[in-house]
């Protein structure tokens, strides 16, 4: 009897503890985007989160055995988030029959390795094509028509003009999100990308019968209403096309935008956007995580049809913003040398910067671009592609960059959107020419003159300058944190009424959010008090207090 009573009491206690613990998981807030000043932040577990990620190669997450062997490499790269795809063909091998084995295993492995996930939905389109559609979609081309080129030839691209395709993609995506809602009370998945690099090839638009019929219809009222309401802020490309036809409030596509290939791209972009909007809405209705789209960029000098056309490119932002208002933002995939130029285009009042594919992992400029993106453009996250590609990261710049950015995360997240932080990176042209000239920026009553070489480094190669970058955060009236690699910062009075000196300069690190002071830097290490100089051989942090004198 005594043992029985003890057992009953223990059982009752266990039930009480279980019931008390259950709401904790259930009450863990959903990841969300939240405005702070002039930007938006990703909120995870109720707190701002700086996403330091890496995107897996396309097929790495399709096998749990393969994926399980990748985590040590990912952890050595310094990530806090992995970006990984889930495939329609693997999730729904038979229509209406779903297999979440790989997804569940991915979640479990990420938790075991203390990582968050950004999930990529490889559905109807991945890099323009439809190779991730299930076999039952691929084979049934009458139910799921293909896009056609100008010559009428079918392409291996599902047409966005098919309501049946939209219904099938929505059903699968919503099923994934419903499963996540049930399986991920820990909020391991913090965001979801809807499709991947949508765009039309090899022509500017779909020339199939469904598309041709849509082209003859009136331009939808929500699009013309958006153009009218945002006329002064429209991108020059869209505004020029619209105003060239008289800035009409209604009419056919030809009447409102003309008949050029540029006008055809607008037409195709609208239908991609509205398809994506409906798909995103279905996913959010099932489980309301932040959702975004990404885009492959167009090369200079290429016309629509000569690049993956009609995706959410900067010159088409207005079409996508009007057609896909449920999508939270547009992310940038960039593999061109002119990173600084492209990244600036994606930071807008209505679009926080997120870089899911920041060129290939292992490149020497990855770290410098991360500091620029986060410091200057308030990026919510940064992620090189093919993070599981390098054999090791022992000699790579990424772990050092992410280590410093992790230490600075509380300061960065506090400063975002408030005008308390600047970032620096030497711009590079598309042809690869590095602009080595010093840069100036205003911050907290000071003018910052930033160079990418010390005065005695006269013969630096452009390739050496390209891998240098950093950020500056104001932490007090005359106090700043300078972090990065190879940058030299001279502080001047913004009004020019006083001279500025370095009162105290130290190197150090943040441990559990508290500054741990290292060497006091003076003499040669500050050029006798003239400037703050970050080491050229790795990413570091320095803290400086300034004084003014006359």
Model regions and ranges:
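The substrate-binding groove and active-site-proximal loops of carbohydrate-active enzymes
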Residues: 53-63, 85-103, 150-171, 183, ...
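Aromatic- and carboxylate-lined catalytic core of secreted/periplasmic carbohydrate-active enzymes
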Residues: 27, 371-496
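N-terminal carbohydrate-binding accessory modules
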Residues: 26-80
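Aromatic-lined substrate-binding rim segments of carbohydrate-active enzymes
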Residues: 66-141, 272-286
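Conserved, mostly hydrophobic/aromatic
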Residues: 46, 82, 110, 176, ...
